[in-house]
Amino acid sequence: MANHKSALKRIRSNETKRLRNRYQHKTTRNAIKKLRDADKKEAEGMLPSVISMVDKLAKKNIIHDNKAANLKSQLTKHVAAL
């Protein structure tokens, strides 16, 4: 266990950030699953918001930039193929 006040605060803030990151990542994953299961009209409506969510994760370094680019490409191709 940490002995310094700053180390204790860092532990608390890291846990808060970890929970926030997990929530955002899980929410985005659920949105991606819904998009993949949706019909064409519904999927086309959802695509911009899902892409925005993926971009926000990449911007906050929750996922890598290349993973975000790959996801956006896959989702766009999936919706176009419906």
Swiss-Prot record:
Give the record's GO CC terms.
cytosol; small ribosomal subunit
One biological process term in Gene Ontology: translation
Molecular-function GO terms, alphabetical? small ribosomal subunit rRNA binding; structural constituent of ribosome
Work out whether the entry's keyword set contains Ribonucleoprotein: yes
Does the record carry RNA-binding as a key word? yes
**What PANTHER family has UniProt attached to this entry?**
30S RIBOSOMAL PROTEIN S20, SMALL RIBOSOMAL SUBUNIT PROTEIN BS20C
Annotated function:
Binds directly to 16S ribosomal RNA.
What's the name of the protein?
A: Small ribosomal subunit protein bS20
The lineage is: Bacteria, Pseudomonadati, Bacteroidota, Flavobacteriia, Flavobacteriales
